[in-house]
Amino acid sequence: LTAIGQSSAQYALRDPDIRLMLRVRADEAGAFEQLVLLFQQRLVVIMKPMVGSREEAEDLAQEAFLRVYKSRKNYHPKAKFSTWLFTIANNLALNSLRSKKRRPQVSFPTTESGQQQQVGIDQRLPEKQSQPEIRLHNVELADVITKALDGLNERQRMAVVLNKYEDMNYADIAVVMGLTSKAVKSLLSRARVNLREVLKKYIYMDGQSSEKYES
């Protein structure tokens, strides 16, 4: 094996997504379609808070996959596949914002049916509440969190999305955003402070600590 071949094989042993991408690189039938099915919704969820529109996020996700396909023959894994893909997505989202020179509006991730996800908020509510009360509480809290996220700058917002929705660590977020791990830690720290200021009044009124929503 060549040095590049050995490197690819080593990464592939650790990351099934890389193995799938290597199948795409080899033009294996059905591999690219499988890759799209695996990551399309995740890309939309990541980019929607950045660009403010599900339709635009879907368009950018398609563009990201197009770039992946066009560059497949030059693909040589140097990190997790998801990190490489999300780097492409982040750059596309930032380029879209720069070209439009507008402030994005943040909305909650949605399911395939278009309904807003509540990211487990209902599990955190007291059991004694009735279902109508829980639904009203969820809607109110989702609106508060959406507005809080909208108050973050672009970098803070992306760092929060990658950290919370994709469960990415500082090092991987740093690769995606072109920053150092220390800078990512600082971004998330400032984002938590900003979120705490917006959320604390609502959450403290419920007698709950805001930490569970920020950590």
What name fits each language-model region?
Residues D59-L66, A79-N91:
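Structural recognition of an alpha-helix C-terminal capping motif at a helix-to-coil junction
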Residues I4-G5, Q10, R25-Q34, V44-E63, ...:
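Short, charged helix-capping/linker segments at alpha-helix termini
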Residues L1-A9, L13, Q105-T111, V119, ...:
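C-terminal edge and immediately downstream basic/flexible tail or linker adjoining helix-turn-helix-like DNA-binding
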Residues A26-A29, K101, D122, P126-M158, ...:
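Amphipathic alpha-helical segment used for protein-protein interaction
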Residues K73-P77, T87-F108, L199:
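Arg/Lys-rich amphipathic alpha helix in sigma70-family domain 2
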Residues L38-Q41, P49-G52, A142, V161-M168:
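Short helix-capping/turn signature of helix-turn-helix
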Residues R25-A26, G52-S53, F65-K80, S99-K101:
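Sigma70-family region 2
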Residues L94, Q156, L162-Y165, Y170-K201:
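DNA-recognition helix of helix-turn-helix
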